[in-house]
């Protein structure tokens, strides 16, 4: 049976269970986590990604020099449209 190619997701979630047989020979069994573990891992990763996006966004805002109300409004609308477009495609 062919094993699917490793991806960062499978590498970060699966682990190898090493067992010893009675004759002392070791066998390795690849174990995949249960659904609860996968969801926990997914939520942790997504929280890290979301935090990174928020930090990057605030750095961009702080880098603006003397923004006018109109330029801020335009910038917010552009970011909102981009955010909504990405949300619909993912």
Swiss-Prot record:
Pfam families linked to this entry: PB1-F2
Q: For this entry, list what GO says about its biological process.
A: symbiont-mediated perturbation of host apoptosis; symbiont-mediated suppression of host cytoplasmic pattern recognition receptor signaling pathway via inhibition of MAVS activity
Site positions for Low pathogenicity = 66
Could you tell me the keywords of this UniProt record? Apoptosis, Host cytoplasm, Host membrane, Host mitochondrion, Host mitochondrion inner membrane, Host nucleus, Host-virus interaction, Inhibition of host innate immune response by virus, Inhibition of host MAVS by virus, Inhibition of host RLR pathway by virus, Membrane, Modulation of host cell apoptosis by virus, Viral immunoevasion
According to the record, the residues making up region (Mitochondrial targeting sequence) are 65-87
InterPro entries assigned:
Flu_proapoptotic_PB1-F2
Q: Where is this region: Disordered?
A: 1-26
Keyword Membrane recorded: yes
From the Swiss-Prot or TrEMBL record, state where the protein is found.
Host mitochondrion inner membrane; Host nucleus; Host cytoplasm, Host cytosol
Keyword match Protein transport: no
Q: Name one GO cellular component term.
A: host cell mitochondrial inner membrane
Q: Where is the composition biased (Polar residues)?
A: 7-16
Q: What superkingdom heads the lineage?
A: Viruses
| Main location class | host cell
- TM region(s), chain numbering: none
Remarks, anything else?
Is not encoded in all strains, and seems to be dispensable for replication.
Question: What does this protein's UniProt record list under function?
Answer: Plays an important role in promoting lung pathology in both primary viral infection and secondary bacterial infection. Promotes alteration of mitochondrial morphology, dissipation of mitochondrial membrane potential, and cell death. Alternatively, inhibits the production of interferon in the infected cell at the level of host mitochondrial antiviral signaling MAVS. Its level of expression differs greatly depending on which cell type is infected, in a manner that is independent of the levels of expression of other viral proteins. Monocytic cells are more affected than epithelial cells.
HAMAP family noted in UniProt: INFV_PB1F2
**Family designation:** Belongs to the influenza viruses PB1-F2 family.
Q: How does it assemble?
A: Oligomer. Interacts with human SLC25A6/ANT3 and VDAC1. Interacts with host MAVS.
How is this protein named in the record?
Protein PB1-F2
What is the originating organism of this protein? Influenza A virus (strain A/Gull/Maryland/704/1977 H13N6)
Taxonomic classification, please? Viruses, Riboviria, Orthornavirae, Negarnaviricota, Polyploviricotina
Q: Which gene encodes it?
A: PB1
